[in-house]
Amino acid sequence: MAQKIQSVKGMNDLLPVKQKDFKLTAAFWQAFEDTVGRWTRAYGYQQIRTPIVEQTGLFVRSIGEETDVVGKEMYTFSDSNDSLSLSLRPEGTASCLRAVVEHNLLYNSPQKLWYMGPMFRRERPQKGRYRQFHQVGIEALGFEGPDIDAEIIAMSADLWEKLGIREYLTLEINSLGNREERAAHRAALVEYLTRYEDKLDEDSKRRLKTNPLRVLDTKNPDLQEICNAAPRLVDYLGEDSQNHYVRFKAMLDGLGIQYIENPRLVRGLDYYNQTVFEWTTDKLGAQATVCGGGRYDGLIEELGGKPAPSIGFAMGIERLLLLVSEYGSLEVNAAPDVYAMHQGEGADLQVMKYAQALRAQGFNVMQHSGYQSLKAQMKKADNSGARFALIVAQDELANGTVTLKDMNGAHGQQTVAAEDLTPTLQQWKNA
């Protein structure tokens, strides 16, 4: 027997049934996708779909060459034809903005776009963290004021309500100011951290040289006291940045959205400025961040477009749905409305015709394949979760009738004329 080929570690199959080490099903995932589609339409966002492979230079320029994502986590390879360096996308914002710039989508008006799809990072797989993971992203492009910052946070809070997990999520916010303010803070931070360099772990020493702001994001408990006493970026904000942040917080207050100000919240990508935020939970162990984002006012220009202030966020679907599956609510109905059975010569063709007619009227119908006893077929109908069973046997063929059974028992079992099949089932379904 040939050896089985396994999936790549950290990359999961999505099946009709739960797996031992991956509890999400395709039906649960589809129900979430349907919810996201309705949610984004309600806020006026249009979907965009981009390739999963991009030129590596896109991520070097946007995310930052010295970030962990670009430096350690991307899947990068050379195109065999022209040695062009390509990478599987590690996040969605850069790809979305590349498409916006390439196709000049901002030529006459701002854009509200959303995307959903797989991302790839070479990380150590664990619960809530995978090498292939999926994100939903929201990008509001060409909007400058703090009102859009507050709106997209309200938008995310609305989704948490729909999924029944709002009480399990905490909003953390911060302001990173503009480029000049960050540069002044960076100089003070480097001077401060250098005094403690002998106490820093190896990862923090590396970040001190490449991206010192990320040192403040360390999870090392031995460094918390040093980080807590470090210069705060908020103390380096100029008047414009302060006003933006104050107005943003006032809008959150007016919307009744509670938040925690976290001066050490910096996010892991270099393109952020001004408003940044994360939604976190204490229900998923170490993987606390479910959703995060912020402003990236200079990124479109960095990618070759005209300056356009913008803001966005992304949520990890696997992590979010693990939270929903344990604590939230999401209506999942993968079962068919009708299980169609047949018995005897000619009944298989007739039941196929009935099934097609029912599907044309909006019923989901699973038709039995093969030739088994009605008892065996009824057992399969029960296992399918169908609400109704449709039976066509020799008596029904001869009399031009069908037998219907309500699997929940409300309407019992009835034999009706074939022409009454659809209206009877519609009446039962709506009762």
Curated annotation (Swiss-Prot):
Keyword Membrane: no
Enzyme class: ligase
Subcellular location(s) of the protein: Cytoplasm
EC assignment: 6.1.1.21
Highest taxon, organism lineage: Bacteria
GO cellular component: cytoplasm
A GO term, aspect molecular function: histidine-tRNA ligase activity
Keyword rRNA processing: no
GO biological process: histidyl-tRNA aminoacylation
Reactions listed under catalytic activity: tRNA(His) + L-histidine + ATP = L-histidyl-tRNA(His) + AMP + diphosphate + H(+)
Record's keyword terms, sorted: Aminoacyl-tRNA synthetase, ATP-binding, Cytoplasm, Ligase, Nucleotide-binding, Protein biosynthesis
Family under the similarity heading: Belongs to the class-II aminoacyl-tRNA synthetase family.
NCBIfam families (alphabetical): hisS
Assembly with partners or alone: Homodimer.
PANTHER family xref list: HISTIDINE--TRNA LIGASE, MITOCHONDRIAL-RELATED (PTHR43707:SF1), HISTIDYL-TRNA SYNTHETASE (PTHR43707)
Protein name: Histidine--tRNA ligase
Gene that produces this protein: hisS
